[in-house]
Structures are given as structure tokens and as C-alpha cells.
Amino acid sequence: MVFGSAASEKTPEEILKGVALMLDEIINDTTVPRNIRAAAEKAKEAVLKEGEEPIVRSATAIHILDEISNDPNMPLHTRTQIWSIVSELERVK
């Protein structure tokens, strides 16, 4: 078993598709306030936007999520999800 090999690295597109799935969890969670779900939807659209480089799509989504990450109405589990999503997006090169 080889750790850290290039074969186990995800491509930027794979990372972005995984992030879109993670954002779907927030979008479909009715316990999350509407403004936060709307921002998650906006971030998902940015991540899946065709015609832009993956790094640009990632940076746009990070910016959107960063703006809402300190919302006092955000449930704690959602804040944790957003931090995880941002960590994934930061891996895109």
C-alpha cells in the first residue's frame, strides 16, 4: 500500500463534484435557514459552472460560503459541514 501516491489523488473535477454532493445535503436540509440554503445553492452553481477553470469555480464557492459561515442562525452541524466543504475546495489546484 502506497500512501500519498498520485493514483489516490482526486482530480479537481472529482473534488468539485464531491463538493456539489455535500452542498446538496445542506440545500435539502429543512432545518437550515432559507438564506443559508440559498447561499449553498449559489455555491453549488459556482462549483458546477461550465467554462471556468476549476480554481476559479472553487474560489468563487469559498467566497460565498465564507460570507455565510459566521451567520448566528446557522445550526452547528451545518457550520461544520461548511468548514469541511471549504477544506475540500482549498484542495483544488
Curated annotation (Swiss-Prot):
Disulfide bonds: none annotated. Pfam families: UPF0147 (PF03685). SUPFAM superfamilies: Ta0600-like. InterPro entries: Ta0600-like_sf, UPF0147. Belongs to the UPF0147 family. This is UPF0147 protein MJ1419.
